[in-house]
Structure formats: C-alpha cells, structure tokens
C-alpha cells in the first residue's frame, strides 16, 4: 500500500489504488467552496473598535494553557510572550498522521443481524462483546492531528550576552495582550532604557504568520531563532536568513491490525528580514544582531494539498517578503475586521483595565463580570475566524491549536456533538461563510460513508459514526460503547440546512445541501427497523457514550431505539420535506420520507417526569453523565419548545434538573450545552448561572475551554449560548431577548442574524427592550415575538410607519422587504 504523499486532489490517486479492494470507493478531489451569501459589515452594524476587546496579562505564559492563539484558518500559533525566550508553537491544519485506507471490519456485515438479535433477546452485554470484535474498525482508532513544531527566539541583552545568562524575571511595565479587534498578539518588554515590542498575526490574505520585532530606545534587537519538533522532522538553514523544516506526521507501530507508520509530509519555512543589522545562519539556527527592527515570516504546507510543499512555502514566503510589513498587517486587519466587525455586544461595566486572569479569578471567587461574558462571546467568534476559513479544514477538537503528537482524543472530529458545537455560533453571529470547511469535510467523508453504508449495513446513502478525520473515514472506532452510533452523518447534514435557513440561498440548497441531506436520509430509510408496534427504531445503536441499567442490574450500552436517534431522524426528515417543497424535488421520495417520519417514536416522558433517553424507560448508572443526548430535540433541534410542546418542555426541564443534581455539566462543553438548553427553555436565571459556571469552573487563563483538558467546543458552545439568550429564531419566529438575565439590565447587541436572513440590532434598558433594528437580506413576512412582558409599540420602515399585525399570543407579523431598514419600538 503506497504512502499518501500527495495533494488533496491526489487523494484520488491513493483511493484508486485502494479501489482494487472490492467495493472500496475513491476519494473526491477537494470540493469547491460552497456558494455563499456573504454578509458585509455596513455602517449600521460596524462597531467602533473598543479597547475592551482584548485579553491582557502582566506576565508571560507559564504554560501552553496561558499562551495566546492566533490563526488564519489554515495556520495557527500559540504565542507565549517570554521575556528571555519567546516560544511560538505552530500548527498547520493538515499535519495529520495516517492515510486513506480500508478500515471496515470484514466480519461486520455478518455480525450486524446477530447483534440486533442479541439485543432483542435481552442480551445486550453479549451483543456489545460481539460488536466490539466484529464491527469496530481495524485498526480500532483513527490517527491524530499533530503539531507542526515550535519556533524559539532566544534574546541577547544589550551587551550581546546570550539568553541563558539573562534573568527571566518579569520587568516592570511588561505587557502581553491579544487584540481581538485586530487579531494581533503583542508582547512588550522594557530592559533598561529600551522597550522591545513583538507583534504577531496570522494572515489569511498572505498565507503567512508574521512576527514583527521593534524597539524604542538605544539598544538594538538581537536574538537567535531555532525551529524544533519532538520527532519525525529535520531542520536546516538555507541562505543566511531562512530556516526550513521537513518531516512526516507519523503514529502507530506498523504492526498487523494497527496504524501504519505513515502520514502527510510537511514543510515549514521561516525567513528573517532585519533592518539595520545582520542575519547569519550557523549551527542550524539564525542569529540576528544589531537590528533596529526584524520581521519574521513563517509558513508551512503539506502533501495533503501540495505536490511540492517546499515550493509552495517558498512562493508564499517570497511573495510576503516583497511587501512592507505595514501592508501585510493592514491587509490582515482589514480581512479580519470584514468578519469580526459585523457583531458587537455591550453588557455591564467596562473592566478591561483589569488583566484578564484577574477578572477570571474574581468570577471564580464568586463575583460577576458581565463584561467578561461579552469578551468571552467575542472570543468565541475570534477563535472561529482564526480556525475555520473557506479553503481550510474545519475546526477540530482543539480548533487549530495543538502542541502534541498524540493529543487527547487525537484532536480529531468527534461528531456525536463536539464538531457540531464548534459551528453552533457560525450563522447567528454573522459568520456563516466560516461553515464552509465543515461542508467540504462532509463531502469528503460521504465517499467512505457510502461504502460503509453499503458494505456494513447493506444500505443506500451514506453513514458516519462518532468520529472522522481529514481523510473522511466513516467507520465505527474506539469500541462498541463509543463507536456503534450511526447518526453522525445525519446530524452533520442538518448544518447545511441551517446555512440555507439563515441565508435563504436556494442555489446552495439545491447544489450542496439537498444531495447531502437526501443521502443521509436514504441511509436512515434502510437502516431503521420497524418493531412489532410499527415504530421505526435504530439499532444496534447507543445514546452517545452513555449506558443504561437493565432490570437485572447489569449495565449495557447497545440498544434498540435510542431517543437521540429518533430525534435526529425526525429533524432530518422534517427539513428534507421543507427543502423538497422549496426545490420541487422528487415527490415519491418525499412521500417515503413523510411516511417514515410518521413512524418515528415521539419523545417519551418517563416515570421520573423526564424525557426518556431510550425507547424503554431505563435508568442510567451515571445519572450526571456529560452527554445529554436525549435533549437534542430541545437544542440544537426544534422538536421541543416551551410554547409548541409545553409538556415535553417541562420534561426537558426535569431531565436537566436530574442531570445537574447528580453532577452533570462537569466538562466544559457539556456546561456550554446546558446554557443553550436553559436559553431554549427561556429560563434566563439558569442560563446565566451556567454561563458563570462555565467561566468559573471550565475556563483556562487564556479563556480556552477546559474539558479538562482543553477542547475548543466549549468556547463555541458558550458563544452560541449567549446568542441564544439574546435572540432565537428556531421556532418559526424571531424571539427577542428570550432569556435575558437580570444581571444584564442594560446593553446592546448589533449584527446578530435570525433565520430568514434578517440582521438585527437590539438595545435594552432596565431589563426591557427599547429599540430593535431589522435589516432583512431576504424578503418575507416574519413573526416577531417581543420580550416577555412587552408589546410592540411601532414599526418604521426607512422612517415611515408600517403595520405590525398582532397575534393572540402577543407576537406580531411584520412584512419585510430586502434592503430596507426597520425600527421596532416597545411598550
């Protein structure tokens, strides 16, 4: 089997070799970016740059969890801000071990009906043992995402002494900050009469990371630069001013049934341009002396995209080196502001004069800081911009930032919630085009997903289980307790519908969303089995990563009819029917979908008053489990709503209360999901309490989410939860301030987006909305629900009064015309 050392398009070539195995389909070339309806910042929603939108500290990062992230989507870096030595940990999104290969367990097709039979006979323990050996993939795990390496800058003092002889004591006036508005990390160190400033940013425009070193004072800039990686790489110098690294992302032992020792080949390049000094290469490092300023250009590439990564890096470095650093920075800032500047949020007092770690410590000690919540909200948006751009890979478990060769859970795409949570804030916080990398990965994974559906399940369409990687593998991995769950593809397909629902881009719906949703539904139509009472149930499956207790006291995982499966199927079928209506698609197919939806079990209320997690009313041995999968119908689904299904909403509340009473929410991402649940239940107090808990219990000094360890999903889930507290549009209406906490009595948000492609600004005082501005990008009549206890007083269209038709429940209908501006006031 040849090693995969090819471009993304040449995944085709590797898959062609693999296709010699019966039924093994080849991978597609890199898909074109989806058609997007870009939202451009306008004078109405372009907020004034605020000094408060920064993370800042009085000391360098003591460890990786204190370093500050920058990223361009494809490239990422963690900046430590050292005094004597700067460490910049580097990532490139496709530095990934492994290869395209057939991972299907050859015994799976024959074992599947046996596993189903054992579960039906009340023998799920035996079923799990069989599935673990006969269905789980070979090898059992997927390879990891890896660090590129580290750039170390060892500074010399004014007398030219090396860093090893200098003190690393933090000097007075030290500053380390991350400016979210400009996407720039700054370190400022004063020694004697000279202040040294280091500015770092990752440019999506120019494909490079830039580090600018400047001084104010008499002493010159002097340092030694080295590249390093723990293993599987070599470093050399080129010319007098360039460091080069070549390596391969390798994992595994190469033994039979295990991962082969192969992965993408990568190349990294660093060039230093000094003004007024000298740069020389010696001992595998670059030495800068006597400089007034120095500019470091960093880039990397791999064989995932490039046939010749070294040549690609040379082109990017050469192009960037021709431009003044001021032009590189201006282009970077403009590109970042085009996205980041669309949304602003103001709540609480401005405490930005306090260091970020001190503000976090106050919250941990029991204090409240609404402004820190606003900063956290914008930090989530910043991180999505930095880790997911059209043309990059999607944000993985750690976004783009990983310092390890074998990171926790492989830093992969865990698609039983974590990857989906990464993209919850994309549409509502006006970053819809950043969804594109996820759609591209789905297209890649569909290829293996079709083969797995056909060869493992005898089904049409495509299936994904609980994990995938940059190669798009679709097999069940890790073990039966985790891997035997077939709803990953169906859940991911809902993200394409969401993008349509927020943009109303029918071309996207037809060309990108419909094919994926249809194939996901085709699999479910074949996979779901009808029981004796006529219900369509999944199985063998599981409620992600959770277990249930049998009447005899045994604990099992595999089941027939996990509630989440039915809820995801219901969501997919419902959206597919809506899409078919918009597109006037295959009526016969839609009739099958409609008939199948009618046979899905509705969410059931168990003996504790809770929503059942399985078709049977089982108890679980871990009642505070981190996954709360059976509340999918509440969030991100829409099947359960307080007004539409009040009984189910009450049962969802009981479910949350029981989980929390038993220690639930103990992981960062789980706590973030809980914020969203309470916001959907319109319980502002609980949503706010869990936002504070997320900050106090699951947030690292650099505001990264702490599972523990770091996972980025909690950051994105927290940002989405704050948005849900301020605006909801999932229930067929635009609900204003549905979960506004008393702790935020006054504030304003601009640039949020509601389904139907309506951009909104909301201002409130004394806990009551005072003014809402609607900017529709797609026309139509919308139901607008004012905040609880308020009513719409007037609606003006470009300064002219227009009618708002009242509904019996207090909401109003407003006809919106594309391109107009509507101002709503309240009483």
Segments predicted by a language model, with ranges:
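C-terminal capping/lid segments that line or modulate ligand- or cofactor-binding pockets
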Residues: 67-89, 94, 135, 147, ...
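Active-site neighborhood of glycoside hydrolase catalytic domains
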Residues: 489-491, 496-520, 533-535, 542-549, ...
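Asparagine-centered strand-capping/turn motif at beta-strand->loop junctions
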Residues: 215, 774-776
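Aromatic-residue-lined binding/catalytic grooves and analogous aromatic/hydrophobic interfacial grooves
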Residues: 27, 31-481, 498-500, 518-521, ...
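Extended, hydrophobic alpha-helical segments in both membrane/secreted and soluble proteins
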Residues: 418, 485-499, 512-526, 670-673, ...
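Bacterial N-terminal signal peptides
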Residues: 9-19
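Sec/Tat signal peptide C-region and signal peptidase I cleavage site
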Residues: 23-24
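Bacterial N-terminal signal peptides that target proteins for export
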Residues: 1-11
């Amino acid at each position: 089997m040849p090693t995969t050392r090819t471009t993304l398009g040449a995944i085709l070539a590797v898959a062609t070799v693999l296709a010699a195995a019966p039924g093994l389909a080849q991978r597609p070339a890199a898909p074109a970016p989806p058609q997007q309806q870009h939202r451009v910042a306008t004078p109405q929603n372009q907020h004034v740059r605020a000094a408060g939108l920064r993370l800042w500290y009085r000391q360098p990062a003591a460890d990786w969890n204190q370093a500050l992230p920058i990223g361009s989507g494809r490239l990422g870096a963690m900046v430590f801000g050292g005094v004597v030595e700067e460490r910049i940990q580097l990532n490139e999104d496709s530095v990934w071990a492994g290869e395209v290969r057939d991972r299907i367990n050859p015994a799976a097709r024959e074992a599947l009906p046996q596993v189903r039979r054992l579960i039906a006979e009340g023998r799920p323990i035996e079923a799990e043992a069989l599935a673990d050996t006969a269905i789980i993939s070979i090898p059992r795990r997927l390879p990891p995402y890896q660090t590129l390496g580290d750039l170390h800058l060892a500074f010399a003092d004014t007398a030219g002494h090396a860093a090893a002889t200098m003190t690393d004591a933090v000097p007075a006036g030290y500053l380390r900050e991350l400016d979210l508005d400009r996407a720039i990390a700054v370190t400022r160190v004063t020694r004697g009469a000279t202040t040294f400033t280091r500015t770092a940013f990752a440019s999506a425009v120019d494909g490079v990371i830039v580090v600018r070193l400047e001084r104010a004072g008499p002493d010159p800039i002097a340092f030694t630069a080295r590249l390093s990686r723990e293993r599987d790489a070599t470093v050399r110098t080129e010319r007098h001013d360039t460091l080069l690294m070549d390596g391969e992302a390798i994992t595994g032992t190469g033994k039979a049934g295990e991962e082969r020792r192969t992965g993408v080949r990568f190349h990294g390049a660093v060039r230093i341009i000094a003004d007024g000094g000298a740069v020389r290469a010696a001992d595998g490092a670059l030495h800068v002396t006597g400089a007034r300023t120095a500019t470091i250009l960093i880039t990397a590439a791999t064989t995932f995209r490039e046939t010749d990564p070294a040549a690609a890096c040379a082109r990017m470095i050469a192009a960037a080196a021709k431009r003044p650093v001021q032009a590189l920075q201006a282009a970077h800032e403009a590109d970042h502001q085009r996205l980041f500047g669309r949304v602003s949020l103001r709540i609480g007092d401005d405490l930005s004069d306090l260091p970020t770690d001190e503000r976090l410590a106050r919250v941990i000690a029991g204090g409240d800081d609404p402004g820190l919540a606003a900063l956290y909200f914008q930090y989530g948006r910043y991180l999505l911009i930095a880790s997911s751009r059209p043309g990059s890979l999607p944000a993985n478990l750690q976004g783009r930032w990983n310092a390890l060769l074998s990171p926790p859970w492989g830093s992969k795409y865990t698609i039983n919630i974590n990857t989906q949570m990464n993209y919850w804030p994309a549409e509502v916080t006006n970053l819809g085009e950043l969804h594109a990398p996820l759609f591209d990965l789905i297209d890649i994974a569909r290829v293996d997903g079709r083969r797995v559906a056909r060869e493992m399940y005898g089904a049409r369409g495509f299936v994904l289980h609980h994990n995938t990687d940059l190669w798009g593998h679709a097999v069940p991995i890790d073990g039966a307790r985790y891997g035997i769950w077939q709803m990953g593809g169906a859940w991911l397909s809902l993200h394409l519908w969401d993008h349509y629902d927020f943009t109303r881009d029918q071309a996207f719906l037809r060309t990108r969303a419909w094919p994926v949703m249809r194939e996901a539904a085709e699999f479910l139509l074949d996979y779901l089995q009808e029981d004796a009472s006529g219900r369509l149930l999944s199985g063998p499956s599981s409620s992600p990563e959770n277990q249930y207790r049998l009447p005899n006291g045994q604990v099992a995982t595999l089941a027939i009819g996990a509630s989440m499966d039915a809820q995801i199927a219901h969501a997919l079928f419902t959206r597919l029917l809506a899409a078919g209506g918009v597109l006037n698609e295959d009526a016969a197919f839609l009739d099958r979908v409609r008939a199948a939806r009618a046979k899905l079990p509705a969410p059931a209320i168990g003996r504790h008053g809770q929503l059942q997690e399985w078709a049977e009313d089982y108890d679980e041995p871990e009642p505070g489990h981190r996954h709360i999968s059976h509340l999918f119908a509440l969030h991100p689904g829409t099947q359960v709503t307080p007004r539409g299904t009040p009984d189910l909403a009450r049962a969802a509340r009981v479910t949350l209360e029981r989980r929390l009473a038993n220690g639930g929410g103990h992981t960062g991402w789980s706590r973030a999901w809980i914020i969203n649940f309470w916001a959907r239940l319109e319980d502002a107090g609980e949503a706010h309490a869990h936002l504070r808990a997320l900050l106090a219990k699951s947030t690292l000094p650099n505001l990264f989410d702490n599972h523990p360890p770091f996972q980025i999903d909690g950051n994105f889930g927290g940002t989405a939860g704050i948005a849900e507290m301020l605006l909801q549009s999932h229930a067929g209406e635009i609900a204003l301030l549905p979960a506004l906490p008393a702790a935020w009595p006054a504030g304003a948000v601009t640039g949020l987006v509601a389904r139907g492609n309506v951009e909104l600004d909301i201002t409130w005082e004394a806990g009551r909305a005072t003014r809402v501005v609607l900017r529709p990008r797609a026309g139509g009549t919308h139901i607008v629900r004012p905040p609880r206890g308020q009513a719409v007083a007037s609606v003006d269209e470009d300064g002219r009064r227009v009618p708002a038709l009242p509904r019996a429940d207090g909401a109003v209908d407003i006809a919106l015309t594309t391109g107009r501006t509507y101002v709503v006031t309240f009483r």
